[in-house]
A protein has these predicted regions:
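Accessory nucleic-acid engagement/destabilization modules that flank
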Residues: 3-8, 12-19, 27-41, 45-267
Length: 267
C-alpha cells in the first residue's frame, strides 16, 4: 500500500465515544456508503419527472444522457465530503468524546507521514471560514472542476456558498487545506490524497478520457435548476448514509466493517 493510500485510510469522517469505547467512520467508507445510497435512490426513489428535469439540465444531449445524469449524481455523492480531507477538518476536536480519541486519530495520520499534524494549531476562526462544504467546493475548483458542479458540493449542507468567498479566502489560508504554506512533503501528501479521492470517483462513475484515465473534462455542464435538484439528492443521500442505525461507526481499531459487502444492503 502506498503512503497516500495508507494515510487516506486513516482519515475520519465521524467519530464518537460510547460507554468508554472509541468508534469512528473512515472518510473513504462514508463516501462509499453515500454513493451506494445515491445509486439506490436514483433507481428506486427519484421520480421519472425529476430525472427528466436533471437530464434536460445537462449539456449532454446524446443517447447516453440518462446514464450520464445517473453517473453524475453518484459522482457527487461519492465526492461530497472531499472537504474533510483537509487538516482544518481532521484536527477538529469532537464535541462529546475524550481528547484521547482525537489524539489517537491524529497520531495515526502523523505516523502515516503527516508530520506535525498532531500538534497543528488552527484556531477557531479558520473552522468557521473553512467548513468542509467550503473547502470541498474550493478543492474541486482547484483541481479543475467547473463551478456549476463544484457548487453542488458547497451546498450539500443546505446553503449555497458565494464563489468569491470560496476562492478568495481560502487562497489566503493554504494551511487550512494543505497544512503548510509552502510546498513540502505534507502539502504534497494532502494534495495526493485529495486528488486520489477525486480521480477514483471520476473513474468509478465513468468520467474518463479515450484512454480510460479519469478526467474532470468528461463532466457535463449543468444548469441552475439541475444544480438545485442534485444538491437535494446529495443532501438526502448524505443524511441516510449518516444514520448510524443503518450505517454504524466501527471500532477505532478497525479500518472497515467485517461484513463490508453486506453494509449497503443492510443499510
Amino acid at each position: 500500500m502506498s503512503q497516500t493510500d495508507t494515510c487516506m485510510s486513516f482519515l475520519w469522517a465521524k467519530k464518537k465515544e460510547q460507554n468508554g469505547r472509541f468508534f469512528w467512520l473512515p472518510l473513504t467508507l462514508h463516501l462509499k456508503d453515500t454513493m451506494g445510497v445515491m445509486d439506490f435512490l436514483w433507481h428506486h426513489w427519484v421520480s421519472e419527472g425529476q430525472k427528466e428535469i436533471i437530464i434536460h439540465a445537462l449539456s449532454d444531449t446524446g443517447e447516453e444522457v440518462v446514464d450520464t445524469a445517473q453517473r453524475l449524481a453518484c459522482f457527487l455523492a461519492g465526492i461530497h465530503d472531499l472537504g474533510k480531507c483537509t487538516p482544518v477538518f481532521q484536527t477538529q476536536k469532537g464535541y462529546q468524546n475524550s481528547p484521547d480519541l482525537d489524539i489517537a486519530l491524529l497520531n495515526r495520520l502523523e505516523q502515516a507521514g503527516l508530520t506535525g499534524i498532531s500538534s497543528l494549531n488552527l484556531d477557531m476562526a479558520p473552522r468557521k471560514r473553512s467548513h468542509h462544504t467550503v473547502t470541498g467546493e474550493y478543492l474541486l475548483q482547484y483541481f479543475g472542476v467547473q463551478q456549476d458542479i463544484a457548487s453542488v458540493i458547497g451546498a450539500h449542507h443546505g446553503k449555497p456558498i458565494d464563489k468569491e468567498e470560496v476562492v478568495t479566502k481560502l487562497k489566503l489560508y493554504p494551511r487550512d487545506c494543505f497544512q503548510d504554506e509552502k510546498e513540502g512533503p505534507c502539502q504534497r501528501l494532502w494534495l495526493a490524497m485529495q486528488k486520489q479521492i477525486l480521480e477514483r470517483n471520476l473513474k468509478k462513475t465513468g468520467f474518463i478520457d479515450s484512454e480510460e484515465n479519469p478526467t474532470v473534462d468528461s463532466l457535463p455542464e449543468i444548469s441552475e435548476i439541475g444544480q438545485v435538484l442534485l444538491s437535494g439528492l446529495v443532501i438526502m443521500a448524505d443524511w441516510i448514509a449518516s444514520n448510524e442505525a443503518y450505517f454504524p461507526l466501527i471500532p477505532l481499531e478497525e479500518n472497515e466493517p467485517e461484513a463490508m459487502e453486506n453494509r449497503l444492503q443492510c443499510g
